[in-house]
Amino acid sequence: MAETNAKRFIKCYNMIDNALRIQGDMRRSISYTEAVRRAARTNGLVKKYEDQLIDYGRLRNAIVHSSNDEFIIAEPHLEVVEDYEKIANLICTPPLAINTICNKNFKSLTAEVKLKEVMEFMFKTGISSIPIYKDDMLIGVAHANKITKILGKMIYEKKDLEKYISETNIEDVLKILMEDNYYTIAEQSITLDRVLSLFEENRKLLLIVITKTGSLLEHPIGIVSVGDIMDINKILDNYA
């Protein structure tokens, strides 16, 4: 026998209520509405659906009598139930970047490689972001836009461009970019909503390098760039 709309709705309510309390380490004495408001401060998905979640919490109280989920006194519309189920899936089992948007078509290079080789590699492969390692530790990311700005400055200052790109190690180029804060590292469990939050929190951020545990001593398993934001939003909008 198929579940009623009310049963499905109550199941979503309980799933979200439990997930928010576990994720935010909140006491059971805190109300559902307060749990939503607190979670919205740090969880991008909860923030996006904050008003709907609160409205659905109030609707739950109209569907059942008091705290007894079995005593149903009203049936919600199917469209409402399906919308609540979608939000519940996003919050309780959020899609991971590594399984969806993450770019796994990349290559890392070592610190002693000359800038000229890096640029040639970017041109041949079309890859614009290359993690750079020294002694098996990530020391930076060679990014096409950042390199272009450095070379543009050299042209403006009428410096010997050919000599610079032929003789300079990529490690020395990265030292110039150390304070730009244009990339960060994350573990493989990072969710799409967290990816969006990172880009929102740091407007200079161009890419996120993903490793198994988020350690600089691990080689990357994927990269997410700021250009993926539109696709991330589409995935979240259609996630069910």
Protein language model features and the residues they cover:
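Short, charged amphipathic alpha-helical segments flanked by flexible coils
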Residues: 22-48
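Hydrophobic alpha-helical packing segments in soluble, helical-rich domains
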Residues: 2-29
